[in-house]
UniProtKB/Swiss-Prot annotation:
It is an enzyme of class 1 (oxidoreductase). It comes from Yersinia enterocolitica serotype O:8 / biotype 1B (strain NCTC 13174 / 8081). One of its GO terms (biological process) is glycine decarboxylation via glycine cleavage system. CDD domains: GDC-P. This is Glycine dehydrogenase (decarboxylating).
Length: 959
């Protein structure tokens, strides 16, 4: 054996696990594209003036087991205290059947947002269940399929109120003074850019004000007081003021639905339904409104439609409200939401059912009553007489009580003057009640729980008369059928089988980077050291989180060429918003508040103009030339016309057209020349890492899609993370937090997310990826991603023209196939090709973005040459089928393309098509051995929007 010990140790083994092609396969692909090495390929494609002289210094690769052991050591520094802090976050008991079969299952967490409904019926059904759950609990007509967090939902409710208000001259938004502080923080940030005046006071004070378009109330106040707002809501309705109510999802199980009391919008966090606190996230927010506001509603909405055979099928409804279509006129900039977490919450409700949820909520409330009675009996005063799960207890020596609590391994809420806060939850036990009583009272005799239980069960008045829910909840069969683990396991598997995820095939979506989410990267997110921490716990209890976040931030600084990173934004869209806010605040600090114009290329992603509008900027579109590059003449003209009003440009690199623009540095220089800042959208960082950086190119700020480039899974439409990297001059202006002091923040800026570090519990995924890849592996990943895209473009360019290329005919990490000439000649559209790919076992590429009538393909570095060839063979076979239509062998109205996809039910039914059953479902060799069967035929989008129905359908429709 000639290998030395270092070679045998194989510390870079994970790189070969992550990158799908072997060295031999890479050489074959290099030969096909006309390069002799990866380095040569990059030299040919990437402009020389932006190539880094050396890779970023992020260190060497570690093996999976080394990285896991290292991260375990870091996680062990987190202290798992019992947290009764509340404030919108509670410990939970995640049902193991959901943990194992969903959260730890790549069939669920590697899927993409369900833009292709035919391959997404499983998670669409789970999301429809989430909407039904939300409608039942809130008492409103329409619910969305989740928002990013409760605070973001509050800000969205304010925006909805202004859009829908009939009081067009009103510019005030009223917030009750006992909403959660982090909610108020995010609302104030959003209101600042919208130019709204926010008034914070006791709820009844709103009746003394004029010019109010919307009101935000919280049913269970942040310090625990339970409010009956029915009379106030009725009066506000008379005044045509739109009302929003923040609600606790567990409390809603027992309490009167705010919608029944007159609220127009109800929202909150679904975290308590089975999702760990995770130091702040990710968690799904629920959001519901009255039917009259449906066109103003933010976020995804799942609707019931029908397929080509007339069968019930689900789809995303009313997409014309969203950023990818309406751009700066969209209701929201949200692209990714929190699908995986919403599905966990919906399945938590399915598993427990209405009786189980009532038992859990009832137990929490009963324990709160028992503790309250014991404390009052012992002479302690409670600040409120009505509550659900939270007590504010007045104490004489607060410091001593808090010190005693810490000695018991307990966190109480500390920020209430002269009192401590205690929020109970589903994990609270009898023993916990005894400990809480002892630390507060110091009475060794303890709490007579059974005696107090008998007392409060007879005469509890902690929930007001009229505030107890009277109507039944969750009467749909789906919530009353799957309560044994066997039935639940099979139901979840049945849903999973309907969907196409990365565990079955490549998902070649352009601008989405559907790469491997390795098992080793996913393992740490369920460790209790990461999962169980409250986001507002004392910082010394989160030392492991701080170290992990600090290391990850430093790596991202090195990989982006920036000077600082902010981890707060919990999606790419939030990152865009945060970055633009930093630019806005920077200009204001220099007395240049007039700078409000944001230049955006015509090819930009829809979130760019939507985010700019949210940040209070005016969008001016910059033209692209015939090669798809930014038109420098038009850029100079638009920048010059903007003059002292120029704020920034938003540019994606490589461009959304899939090429490395050779003039990118000149673009940056032009904008800087006119006093603007450069926002470089990080959507395509997978073609930059290790090769160049935004900072080296000349940008000032970027967001990073950790759910693209750095391996956080898409989860079927979330979670995501969108931290921003900034140059030093923008660092003082990144988001801060009103509850937690963030290290390094020299000025206090408003928050964009509820938690200080966003969805902190999924950051270990990106930490693991970078640690296991090292500098060399990260660069190689980018190189192979570029190789794979060029290999596909080279193999397919004769059959499908590649719309945009660089000067040498190359592309970056994705390519755009132009279907327009084919459609004009044959009538076959990009939609037909996308749906036919399902029969071949593939998710479609991105359709009609950034150019209508095209398909954008991004293979990522994780796919093997075998899988790339399988996709290429499918596309070539489809091209041959199109030729048959062109020659008249198949009629345009009846052929495998326009009829795609084909289902099992169709296969065994009556067959009158001019092509065989075998060709329909097994179009090429190899499909049979791993056949994906869609559960529905092509969706009827027009029917779905004309007949909007967004609740659960009869169970028979699924059978």
């Amino acid at each position: 054996m000639t290998q030395n010990l270092s070679q045998l140790e194989h510390n870079d083994a994970f790189i070969q696990r992550h990158i799908g092609s072997s060295a031999e396969q890479q050489q074959q692909m290099l030969a096909a594209v006309g390069a002799n090495s990866l380095s040569t390929l990059i030299q040919q494609i990437v402009p020389a003036d932006i190539q880094l002289p050396s890779p970023p210094p992020v260190g060497e690769a570690a093996t999976e087991h080394q990285a896991l052991a290292e991260l375990k050591g870091i996680a062990s520094q987190n202290q798992r205290y019992k947290s009764y802090i509340g404030m919108g976050y509670s410990p939970v008991l995640t049902p193991p059947v959901i943990l194992r079969n969903m959260l730890e299952n790549p069939g669920w967490y590697t899927a993409y947002t369900p833009y292709q409904p035919e391959v997404s019926q499983g998670r669409l059904e789970a999301l429809l269940n989430f909407q039904q759950l939300t409608q039942d609990l809130t008492g409103l007509d329409l619910a969305s399929a989740s928002l990013l967090d409760e605070a973001t939902a509050a800000a969205e409710s304010m925006a909805l109120a202004k859009r829908a208000s009939k009081l067009k001259d009103a510019n005030r938004f009223f917030v009750a003074d006992d909403v959660h502080p982090q909610t108020l923080d995010v609302v104030l940030t959003r209101a600042e850019t919208f130019g709204f005046e926010v008034i914070v006071d006791r709820a009844e004070k709103v009746l003394e004000l004029d010019g109010v378009f919307g009101v935000l109330l919280q049913q269970v106040g942040t310090t625990g007081e339970l409010h009956d707002y029915s009379a106030l809501l009725a009066e506000l309705k008379k005044r045509k003021i739109i009302t929003s109510v923040a609600a606790d999802i567990m409390a809603l199980v027992l309490l009167t639905a705010p919608g029944k009391q007159g609220a127009d919008v109800v929202f909150g966090s679904a975290q308590r339904f089975g999702v760990p606190m995770g130091y702040g996230g990710p968690h799904a927010a629920f959001f519901a409104c009255r039917d009259e506001f449906k066109r103003s509603m933010p976020g995804r909405i799942i609707g019931v439609s029908r397929d080509a055979a007339g069968n019930t099928a689900l789809r995303m409804a009313m997409q014309t409200r969203e950023q990818h279509i309406r751009r700066e006129k969209a209701n929201s900039n949200i692209c990714t939401s929190q699908v995986l977490l919403a599905n966990i919450a919906s399945l938590y409700a399915v598993y427990h059912g209405p009786q189980g949820l009532q038992r859990i909520a009832g137990r929490i409330h009963r324990m709160t009553d028992i503790l309250a009675a014991g404390l009052q009996q012992a002479g302690l005063a409670l600040r409120f007489t009505h509550w659900f799960d939270t007590l504010t207890v007045e104490v004489k020596d607060k410091a001593a009580v808090l010190a005693r609590a810490l000695s018991f391994g307990i966190n109480l809420r500390t920020d209430i003057h002269g009192a401590v806060g205690i929020t109970l939850d589903e994990t609270t036990s009898r023993e916990d009640l005894q400990i809480l009583f002892t630390l507060l009272v110091g009475d060794n005799h303890g709490l007579d729980i059974d005696l107090l239980d008998a007392k409060v069960s007879q005469n509890s008045q902690s929930i007001q008369t009229g505030m107890l829910r009277q109507e039944p909840i969750l009467t749909h069969p789906v919530f009353n059928r799957y309560h044994s683990e066997t039935e639940m396991m099979r139901y979840m598997h049945r849903l999973e089988r309907k969907d196409l995820a990365l565990n079955q095939a490549m998902i070649p979506l352009g601008s989405c980077t559907m790469k491997l989410n390795a098992a080793a990267e996913m393992i740490p997110i369920t460790w209790p050291e990461f999962a169980e921490l409250h986001p507002f716990c004392p910082p010394e209890q989160a030392a492991g989180y701080q170290q992990m976040i600090g290391q990850l931030s430093q790596w991202l600084v090195q990989l982006t060429g920036y000077d600082a990173v902010c981890m707060q934004p919990n999606s790419g869209a939030q990152g865009e918003y945060a970055g633009l806010l930093a630019i806005r605040r920077y200009h204001e600090s220099r007395n240049q508040a007039s700078r409000h114009i944001c230049l955006i290329p015509s090819s930009a992603h829809g979130t760019n103009p939507a985010s700019a509008q949210m940040a209070g900027m005016s969008v001016v579109v910059v033209a692209c030339d015939k090669q798809g590059n930014i038109d420098l003449h038009d850029l100079r003209q638009k920048a010059g016309e903007a003059g002292d009003e120029l704020s920034c440009i938003m540019v994606t690199y490589p461009s959304t057209h899939g090429v490395y623009e050779e003039t990118i540095r000149e673009v940056c220089q032009i904008v800087h020349q006119f006093g603007g800042q450069v926002y470089l959208d990080g959507a395509n960082m997978n073609a930059q890492v290790g090769i160049t950086t935004p900072g080296y190119i000349g940008a000032d700020v970027s967001h990073l899609n950790l759910h693209k480039t750095f391996c956080i899974p898409h989860g079927g439409g979330g979670p995501g993370m969108g931290p921003i990297g900034v140059k030093a001059h923008l660092a003082p202006f990144v988001p801060g937090h009103s509850v937690v002091q963030i290290d390094g923040m020299t000025t206090q800026q408003g928050a964009v997310s509820a938690a200080p570090f966003g969805s902190a519990s999924i950051l270990p995924i990106s930490w693991m990826y970078i640690r296991m890849m090292g500098a060399d592996g990260l660069k190689q990943a980018s190189q192979v991603a570029i190789l794979n895209a060029n290999y596909i473009a080279t193999r397919l360019k004769e059959a499908y023209p590649v719309l945009y290329t660089g000067h040498d005919g190359s592309v970056a990490h994705e390519c755009i196939l132009d279907i327009r000439p084919l459609k004009e000649a044959t009538g076959i559209s990009e939609m037909d090709i996308a749906k036919r790919l399902i029969d071949f076992g593939f998710h479609a590429p991105t359709m009609s973005f950034p150019v209508a009538g095209t398909l954008m393909v991004e293979p990522t570095e994780s796919e093997s040459k075998v899988e790339l060839d399988r996709f290429i063979d499918a596309m070539l076979a489809i091209r041959a089928e199109i030729e048959k239509v062109a020659r008249g062998e198949w009629p345009l109205e009846d052929n495998p393309l326009v009829n795609a996809p084909h289902t099992q039910a169709e296969l065994v039914g009556e067959w009158q098509h001019p092509y065989s059953r075998e060709l329909a479902v097994f179009p090429v060799a190899g499909v049979m051995e791993n056949k994906y069967w869609p559960s529905v035929k092509r969706l009827d989008d027009v029917y779905g929007d004309r007949n909007l129905f967004c609740s659960c359908v009869p169970i028979s429709d699924y059978e």
